[in-house]
Amino acid sequence: LEAGEPIGLDISRDELAFFPLIYWPIVPDAPKPSPETLARIDTYMKQGGTILFDTRDAVEAAPGPGGETKTPGMVALRAILSSLDIPELEPAPPEHVLTKTFFLLRDFPGRFTNGRLWVEAMPAASDEATEQRPARAGDGVSSIIITGNDFAGAWATRPDGLALLPLVPNEPRQREFAFRAGVNIVMYALTGNY
């Protein structure tokens, strides 16, 4: 089974309901979406859609706590998210369903391995936040996933099937695990917390 060609999505005009998962690579110097587009994104996420934001710059993060929050891609992402109703986020815990949706995974590498995968923080069963986010309460799928590991860069291949971009640090099986992370994310977006 081979994946088809990716299709471009105009988030300001296309019908988003047909896409249960949107992969959004962040470009640091791209203009911020219009207020109307941001409202469409907010509605999409509140109605059960999931957006995977990839800043693709984990390798640029300064070492130590908070280093990944200061990369150019993360600064640009924060500007976008500041206009949205985003729930509290947390690094995907080891027991998160994303670690076992299809493949058993300990982490989520892409071209880079040092970035963390962020998801909606799991509210307590009696938390009012559950009532305010009915789509999330129904299927357990995070409406937002954030990484800096450049998944698409790890997945990209040339026409002859060879990898398009190098991996950093190019650990054994890193690209294979990047594909596995992608499969888990798609399965998670489609099936929820089965």
Where are these regions (language model features)?
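An acidic, glycine-rich "communication" segment
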Residues: 59-161, 174, 179
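Aromatic-Pro/Gly-enriched surface loop or interdomain linker
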Residues: 1-21, 28, 151-152, 159-194
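Helical hinge/lid and interdomain linker segments adjacent to catalytic or ligand-binding clefts
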Residues: 1-72, 147
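Sec/Tat-exported extracytoplasmic proteins
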Residues: 26, 45, 49, 81-88, ...
